[in-house]
Amino acid sequence: MKNWKTSAEQILTAGPVVPVIVINKLEHAVPMAKALVAGGVRVLELTLRTECAVEAIRLIAQEVPDAIVGAGTVTNPQQLAEVTAAGAQFAISPGLTEPLLKAATEGTIPLIPGISTVSELMLGMDYGLREFKFFPAEANGGVKALQAIAGPFGKIRFCPTGGISLKNYRDYLALKSVLCVGGSWLVPADALESGDYDRITALAREAVAGATA
């Protein structure tokens, strides 16, 4: 972690809402990122669920300097190296493995690994990590479960993701242990497909306003 250019905490505190994005067409990447930034959302998680995801990260990193673009669904050291080379400023994984944790601590961008149990949390802590993704948040018991997991670990911070929506995101943000939340509602698939970037900007503005109210 000594080579990380920035900390996971710095990334997550730039939230408070991180859109979890699935890009199917490369031409959507830059206008979508600009639309989110215009709405006050700068930290973007592009999931590695499609073939063009890495190139989309590269384009956003090059063409939208106000965005803090990272990679989601990073599951192995090879992917971590690939997204780092593409210009990702952080990486998020759905879970954690020792090979991935080792690669992250030796790499140059912060990894925010997913955890759903205390044992997983403690493994990540053994590698020096202090910020984690609580995933899948709602399926794992939601706010009450996260409160229970976070209880013994006063210095650990979280970005809950999974089942988070406009209806419940403020409940998570109210927790002391939560720096930001991740959610897919900010970039609806139909808005992306139709090029309705004004709608994406409006959703971003709404989320930021609600988080800071």
From Swiss-Prot:
Its main location: cytoplasm. One of its GO terms (cellular component) is cytoplasm. It comes from Dickeya dadantii (strain 3937) (Erwinia chrysanthemi (strain 3937)). It catalyses: 2-dehydro-3-deoxy-6-phospho-D-gluconate = D-glyceraldehyde 3-phosphate + pyruvate. CDD domains: KDPG_aldolase. The keyword Lyase applies. This is 2-dehydro-3-deoxy-phosphogluconate aldolase. One of its GO terms (molecular function) is (R,S)-4-hydroxy-2-oxoglutarate aldolase activity. InterPro entries: Aldlse_KDPG_KHG (IPR000887), Aldolase_TIM (IPR013785), KDPG/KHG_AS_1 (IPR031337), KDPG/KHG_AS_2 (IPR031338). The record marks 161 as: Plays a major role in determining the stereoselectivity.
